[in-house]
Design a protein with these regions (language model features):
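Positively charged, hydrophobic/aromatic-enriched amphipathic segments
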Residues: 1-23, 109-113, 122, 126-139
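An N-terminally focused, membrane-permeabilizing/fusogenic/translocator signature enriched
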Residues: 1-53, 204-211
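Surface-exposed polar/charged interaction patches
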Residues: 14-17, 28-35, 92-97, 110-113, ...
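Alpha-helix boundary/N-cap detector
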Residues: 16-20, 77-81, 85, 98, ...
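A glycine-rich, hydrophobic loop/mini-helix early in the fold
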Residues: 52-80
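Membrane pore-forming effector domains from diverse proteins
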Residues: 71-76, 112-170, 176
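Membrane-inserting effector segments that mediate pore formation, membrane fusion
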Residues: 76-126
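Long, compositionally biased interface segments
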Residues: 156-211
Length: 211
């Protein structure tokens, strides 16, 4: 034949199930509702994705059974957003800690049109904040700050990392936070996911967890 031939695959493969939590993934495995290969691979792909594969079969192929993508709130790091939405996002999309409360307090009392830059480093800022019903004072914008955004599966500990907090006056006060840890949080998050799954599946020896 002058056309490429392909071997007919007699082994049917299931389509991947979509999930959004690690707990539902563990429940699915422990329920033993589907027949699986003797050896299975749980692959932690990223801080927001886990996949379940079979080991290689006779045709050197893997069955892709489950895809878990974390259902997380969205936050635009590195982008200035208006003051009110920033405060709401900080309260709803970040775990409480001392620095979060500090940023919230500062952002909640700053006056429009008073954000000013000073010094030679181009990083430090100051602004006028309300210190009482009728009193005001200049204050330094806190930097850097350690925050804990919800950015991996909620079943595991959320990594804390450093951020640069910036403000500007443009159609009202606008705020932004910029990641300052070089992405190191991703490795910590993936390690946390791996440990969680290893602990949950410790009695099921056919499952190997990798990242």
């Amino acid at each position: 034949s002058d056309k490429p031939l392909e071997r007919i695959n007699y082994i049917p493969y299931a389509g991947a199930i979509e999930m959004i939590t690690l707990s539902s993934f563990v429940e699915y495995i422990k329920a033993n509702v589907d027949v699986m290969a003797d050896k299975m691979i749980v692959h932690v792909v990223s801080p927001t994705e886990v996949r379940l594969y079979s080991a290689l079969d006779a045709d050197r192929k893997r069955e892709y059974l489950v895809n878990v993508r974390a259902g997380l709130p969205d936050f635009r790091f590195g982008s200035f957003i208006d003051h009110e939405n920033f405060v709401i996002a900080l309260q709803s999309k970040f775990a409480p800690n001392e620095d979060r409360d500090l940023v919230l307090k500062f952002a909640g009392t700053v006056e429009d049109g008073t954000v000013a830059q000073y010094g030679d480093d181009g990083v430090t800022q100051k602004a006028t904040v309300k210190t009482g019903l009728a009193s005001k004072a200049d204050a330094v914008v806190p930097n850097p700050v350690t925050l804990i955004p919800y950015r991996t599966f909620l079943e595991v500990q959320q990594p804390a990392s450093d951020f640069i907090f910036r403000m500007k006056s443009a159609n009202g006060v606008q705020c932004a936070i910029f990641e300052a840890d070089g992405g190191a949080w991703k490795n910590e998050a993936m390690d946390n996911i791996k440990e969680y799954l290893k602990n949950e599946l410790t009695d099921l020896k056919q499952f190997t967890v990798i990242s």
